[in-house]
Amino acid sequence: MGIIVLLVFVFCAFYVQNRGAVQHVKLVRKISDHSNIFGPINCLFYFFSKIKKSAYIDTSNFPELKTLTDNWETIRDEAISLNDAVQIKSSEQKDDLGFNSFFKTGWKRFYLKWYGASLFSANKLCPKTVNLINSIPAVKGAMFAMLPPGARLVKHRDPYAGSFRYHLGLVTPNSEECFISVDGEEYYWKDGEAVMFDETFIHFAENKTDINRIVLFLDIKRPVTFFLVDWVNEVFSRIVMAATTTRNMDGDKIGAINRLFPYIFKVRVVGKRIKKANRPAYYLLQYSVYLLIIYGIFF
C-alpha cells in the first residue's frame, strides 16, 4: 500500500513539474521543489477546476471582484497612507515562512487577511479596504505588496493550487519595465487594472524602473465542479493555510507554522553554512533526509 501511495505522489509531482511551458531546468530543482509535497491534492484541483488551464485567468470569471476595480482609488489611498507610515514592510521577527525568501530582494507586504479573519492591524489602519475584501467570500488571502525599484523575484511556483492569484495595480510605474512573467507570458502592471493568474505555473517579477510598485494582492478560491474537492479545499485552508498567518504588528495573531519558523530558520542557516563549506556533503545530507522521510512515511 505504501508503494502505491508513493507512486501516486511521484506521478502527481511529475505532472506538476511538467504542466507548463516553462519548467525548472535542473533535475535537483525539480526534485526539491516544495510544490511536490502538495502534488496529489493539487492534481485534484486541476482535474475538477471550473477554469481551464491557462497562465492568466480572465477576471470576468469572477464578477464579484469588479467592486475592487470600481473602488481602486479608495484602496490605493489607504495603501499610500500605510506606505507613508512605513507599515508596508518585511517581517522583523522571522515569522513569515511563506514569503521569507522574498524579503532579501526588498519586497514588502502588509497583510489584510490570511485564510481566516482580517487582521486586527488591518481593521484599524485600512478599514475601507478590509470591508471591501470581506464582502467577497471568494477572497481567502489579501495583502498590499510592494516591489521596489531594481527588485527581482526569482522564478518559482507557489505550492498550493486551491486558489488563483489576483493583483490590482494601485501605485505602479505603468511601464513594461515593471512586469510579471507567468509561464513565459509577460504582463506589466497598470494603475487601476486587475490581472489574475495561476500561481502554480512558474513565474517571476521584476521592477527595472525607479518607481515603487504597490498592488492589492489576493488569493481567490479556485472554483471546482465537485463538492467534495471544494470541501477538501475549505478544510485544508482552515487547517494548513491558516497556520501560516503572521502579523503586521503586535496584537495580530500568528499561526502555528509561523510560530515554529524561527526555529526552522536556524536549521536552514546551518544548512546554508554546510552548503557553502562543502557542497557535495550538503547534497548528500539533504537527499539522505529526503529518503528517510520517504521511508518513514511510505514503508
Regions found by a protein language model. Give the residues of each.
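Fe(II)/2-oxoglutarate oxygenase catalytic core
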Residues: 1-143, 147-157, 175-178, 214, ...
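Conserved metal-binding segment of the jelly-roll/cupin
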Residues: 188-202
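A generic beta-sheet turn/junction motif
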Residues: 148, 159-161, 182, 209-211
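Short beta-strand or tight-loop elements
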Residues: 140, 151, 162-166, 201
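A short hydrophobic beta-strand segment most commonly corresponding to one strand
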Residues: 165-170, 196, 211-226
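Short beta-strand His + acidic residue motifs that chelate non-heme Fe in jelly-roll/DSBH
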Residues: 153-156, 178-180, 197, 203-209
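Short, solvent-exposed loop/turn segments at secondary-structure junctions
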Residues: 149, 175, 201-203, 221-223
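A short beta-strand-loop-beta hairpin characteristic of the jelly-roll/cupin
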Residues: 170-191
